């Protein structure tokens, strides 16, 4: 029989105190909704339905083309939310997973185990449960003397005995699809919240003598639902530990995994060394045997093998193998540093291609430039690429030597093996094999300094 899935993503998330829908807050680089969707994908649902409501279009954009959607215009409880999916799933043979979109720590493995347990035990409903040291706020799993699940009691409706139970409802279930929608027609709002509880269908199944089971998570952390910023930070912490552990198992060295922040889609090859306080975001890739030192921050970039990035920021760029960057360099979007490039102290590169083995050691700005191989930039070089309205390109050919404090006024071309003298302002193209000097000639005024206040003769 087929698997189906319903993801509940309609809530406002009032306790988040945010204009953003709760399920769109991010954990380790992707939204909570995406984490849940990826976990659900492991069970290979024949159809996935996402229930949306608050700021529905924002939520729809995240899974557009990957899920069917249904609207819950009024938030009248979890049971009501699942009712909204009936049009998409009614009459289908199989089992349906129901899961909240604010549970980013759930794993696909656990959901697969839940489905298998449900099918193997021929249950009409199976509850995913966990054991909590402090169960306050959770619905409790109530069992009879034979260990069978009889009902789920919400915190506000639980008596003193029921409040002592530590087995809690995670809010994730598997149901026989047809029986789910049949039972939903018989639930009501006669409870402390005045809502349609999805959990009431469990009591209906039990009253009909149908089999209800529970599968317990091995790891309570997977059950975490995020309702506020405190829980969001907890989820981030758990996810960070998982991600870093996986990379370490796969051969990456961490100086301090508790102070290293890596998004879930980052790829790192073996034998990379990562020092403390490094952040890798988005879809960054890091090649083998590279070293990322303390304070490095990389976003959506590809870093080649055997590179060394020292306390620098790289955004939406490519750094090829054997390059060195930093310390305190900034590689801005749409840049490419080719093999063996050295970008040093306080150098900024933006929207530029830097050829093989080119060096810009310190205090340089390279913007909107195409630079050949084996070029040397002296300290203080500036490509002047913006006139207040438009950006212009600088082209520097192979083996050029750019003297310290050169100002290159784009648009500009500097030929192969050309040299610009230190301190020059270059406004015209420089032919290959030429020296360009664009500065005033020095004039010495002998004896003039005697009249200046700093001169010893002027001191009293």
Curated annotation (Swiss-Prot):
Binds 1 Mg(2+) ion per subunit. It comes from Streptococcus thermophilus (strain ATCC BAA-491 / LMD-9). Mg(2+) binds at residues 102, 227. Residues 251-460 are annotated as: N-acetyltransferase. Residues 230-250 are annotated as: Linker. Its main location: cytoplasm. PANTHER family: BIFUNCTIONAL PROTEIN GLMU, NUCLEOTIDYL TRANSFERASE. This is Bifunctional protein GlmU. The gene is glmU. GO terms for biological process: cell morphogenesis; cell wall organization; lipid A biosynthetic process; peptidoglycan biosynthetic process; regulation of cell shape; UDP-N-acetylglucosamine biosynthetic process. Keywords: Acyltransferase, Cell shape, Cell wall biogenesis/degradation, Cytoplasm, Magnesium, Metal-binding, Multifunctional enzyme, Nucleotidyltransferase, Peptidoglycan synthesis, Repeat, Transferase. Acetyl-CoA binds at residues 379, 385-386, 404, 422, 439. InterPro entries: Bifunctional_GlmU (IPR005882), GlmU-like (IPR050065), GlmU/GlgC-like_hexapep (IPR056818), GlmU_C_LbH (IPR038009), Hexapep (IPR001451), NTP_transferase_dom (IPR005835), Nucleotide-diphossugar_trans (IPR029044), Trimer_LpxA-like_sf (IPR011004). Its EC number is 2.7.7.23, 2.3.1.157. Catalyzes the last two sequential reactions in the de novo biosynthetic pathway for UDP-N-acetylglucosamine (UDP-GlcNAc). The C-terminal domain catalyzes the transfer of acetyl group from acetyl coenzyme A to glucosamine-1-phosphate (GlcN-1-P) to produce N-acetylglucosamine-1-phosphate (GlcNAc-1-P), which is converted into UDP-GlcNAc by the transfer of uridine 5-monophosphate (from uridine 5-triphosphate), a reaction catalyzed by the N-terminal domain.
């Amino acid at each position: 029989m087929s698997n189906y899935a319903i993801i509940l993503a309609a809530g406002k998330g009032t306790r988040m105190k945010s204009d953003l829908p709760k399920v769109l807050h991010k954990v380790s680089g992707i939204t909570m909704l995406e984490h849940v969707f990826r976990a659900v994908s492991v069970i290979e649902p024949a159809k996935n339905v996402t229930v949306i409501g608050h700021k529905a279009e924002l939520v729809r954009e995240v899974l557009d083309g990957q899920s069917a959607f249904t609207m819950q215009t009024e938030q009248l409880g979890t049971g009501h939310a699942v009712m909204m999916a009936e049009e998409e799933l009614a009459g289908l043979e199989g089992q349906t997973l129901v899961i909240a979109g604010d549970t980013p720590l759930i794993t696909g493995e656990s959901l697969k185990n839940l489905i298998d347990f449900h099918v193997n035990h021929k249950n009409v409903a199976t509850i995913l449960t966990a054991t909590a040291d402090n169960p306050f706020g959770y619905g409790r799993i109530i069992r009879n003397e034979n260990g069978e699940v009889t009902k789920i009691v919400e915190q506000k409706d639980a008596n003193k005995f029921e409040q002592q139970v530590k087995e809690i409802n995670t809010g994730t279930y598997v149901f026989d699809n047809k029986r789910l929608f049949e039972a939903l027609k018989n639930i009501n709002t006669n409870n402390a919240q005045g809502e349609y509880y999805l959990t009431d269908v469990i009591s209906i199944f039990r009253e009909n003598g149908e089999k209800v089971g529970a599968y317990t998570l091995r790891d309570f952390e997977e059950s975490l639902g995020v309702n506020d910023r405190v829980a969001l930070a907890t989820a981030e912490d758990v996810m960070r530990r998982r991600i870093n552990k996986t990379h370490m198992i796969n051969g990456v060295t961490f100086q301090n995994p508790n102070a290293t922040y890596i998004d879930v889609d980052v790829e790192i090859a073996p034998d990379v060394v990562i020092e403390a306080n490094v952040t890798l975001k988005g879809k960054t890739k890091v090649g083998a045997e590279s070293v990322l030192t303390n304070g490095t921050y990389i976003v959506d970039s590809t870093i080649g093998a055997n590179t060394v990035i020292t306390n620098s920021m790289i955004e939406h760029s490519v750094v090829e193998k054997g390059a060195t960057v930093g310390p305190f360099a900034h590689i801005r979007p749409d840049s490419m540093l080719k093999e063996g490039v050295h970008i040093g102290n306080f150098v900024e590169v933006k929207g530029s291609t830097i050829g093989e083995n080119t060096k810009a050691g310190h205090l340089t700005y390279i913007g909107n430039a195409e630079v050949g191989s084996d070029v040397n930039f002296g300290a203080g070089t500036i490509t002047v690429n913006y006139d207040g309205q438009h950006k212009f390109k600088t082209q520097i050919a192979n083996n050029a030597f750019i003297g310290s404090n050169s100002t290159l006024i784009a648009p500009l071309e500097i030929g192969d093996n050309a040299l610009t003298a230190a301190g020059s302002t270059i406004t015209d193209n420089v032919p290959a094999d030429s020296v360009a000097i664009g500065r005033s000639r020095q004039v010495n005024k002998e004896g003039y300094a005697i009249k200046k206040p700093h001169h010893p003769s002027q001191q009293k």
